[in-house]
Amino acid sequence: MLAGRDFLSNLDMTSAELRAVMDTAHSMKAGEWRAVKPLSGLSLALVFEKASLRTRTTFDVGMYQLGGHAITLSNTEIGLGTRERVSDVARNLERWVDGVMGRVYLQQTLVELAQHARIPVINGLSDMLHPAQLLADYQTIEEEFGQDLRGKRVVYIGDGNNLANSHIHMGILTGTDVTVVTPVGYEPNAGVLMDAVKAGVEVHLTNDLDAIQGADVLYTDVWISMGQEAEADIRRRAFRGYQVTPEMLETISPDGIFLHCLPAHYGEETVPEATEHPKSRVFDQAENRLHAQKALLYHVLGDMKPRW
């Protein structure tokens, strides 16, 4: 299974492995693991190039609840690729801790960490992908629609960014029908789209807002990600009209739900009335970061024993 392996992309799992993680996440949320400490004596380094609320809190609390320990390292302390080579950071951390979670600017940084560390590396966010977030997203979706999600319409509206890319990967694994609604020039990564082609999975790309109608899941994310501030005005103009509002939520399936990974830039990709709408599951989704990532940590680190 996933024991001892890197998790840089949702496609680092098989569908069966994803099912095992999801089942564990649901049982953890139900309180069935409250007295179990499978990661006792293990440590996880949390490496941050980007600011974080949900990623830092949930991985830290998750390790604690499973009996392990997390240590947070900011980029001002480490200087990935500046103060020290990424490979040297990896070869140091592997001597002290049992795994690394990285929330970084570039996917290549995680690839380098994984290449040089003999311990598992987990993607907590990169410019390319956000796979840990998608575990929480799909836990939330399963809470609404059950385990068999084949044919459910997941419509992502906004920037074809790391979230859109990871939604495509999850569509490959789960059989959801993924549509990305985005302005011309802001489509998902070409390599990720090729992953779908190779898997024989059709991804629907459009700039037609009518594609939202009847969606089972409507998902959005910020128009301006960290590091894109210089493009803010251009992006706001490009995405005008792509804002999720309560009126838009009335056009999705009657049983449909609205998700946003947060933080929300209110007045841009959505408004407070949407995240507070009866169809919103945004804060359930945020809670599930804890349960889904605990499940991931258990499956990746759970077979390890303390070295000292």
Swiss-Prot record:
Name used for this protein in its record: Ornithine carbamoyltransferase
Lineage per the UniProt record: Bacteria, Thermotogati, Deinococcota, Deinococci, Deinococcales
Class in the EC hierarchy, top level: transferase
Binding site for L-ornithine: 162, 221, 225-226
Organism this protein belongs to: Deinococcus radiodurans (strain ATCC 13939 / DSM 20539 / JCM 16871 / CCUG 27074 / LMG 4051 / NBRC 15346 / NCIMB 9279 / VKM B-1422 / R1)
Record keywords, A-Z: Amino-acid biosynthesis, Arginine biosynthesis, Cytoplasm, Transferase
Annotated InterPro entries: Asp/Orn_carbamoyltranf_P-bd (IPR006132), Asp/Orn_carbamoylTrfase (IPR006130), Asp/Orn_carbamoylTrfase_sf (IPR036901), Asp_carbamoyltransf_Asp/Orn-bd (IPR006131), Orn/put_carbamltrans (IPR002292), OTCase_ArgI (IPR024904)
Gene name linked to the record: argF
Keyword Secreted attributed: no
Pathway: Amino-acid biosynthesis; L-arginine biosynthesis; L-arginine from L-ornithine and carbamoyl phosphate: step 1/3
Single GO MF annotation: ornithine carbamoyltransferase activity
NCBIfam families: orni_carb_tr, PRK00779.1
Positions that bind carbamoyl phosphate: 103, 130-133, 261-262, 289
Source superkingdom: Bacteria
Gene3D superfamilies: Aspartate/ornithine carbamoyltransferase
Main function: Reversibly catalyzes the transfer of the carbamoyl group from carbamoyl phosphate (CP) to the N(epsilon) atom of ornithine (ORN) to produce L-citrulline.
Residues of the signal peptide: none
Family from the record: Belongs to the aspartate/ornithine carbamoyltransferase superfamily. OTCase family.
GO biological-process terms attached to the record: arginine biosynthetic process via ornithine; citrulline biosynthetic process; L-arginine biosynthetic process
Chief location bin: cytoplasm
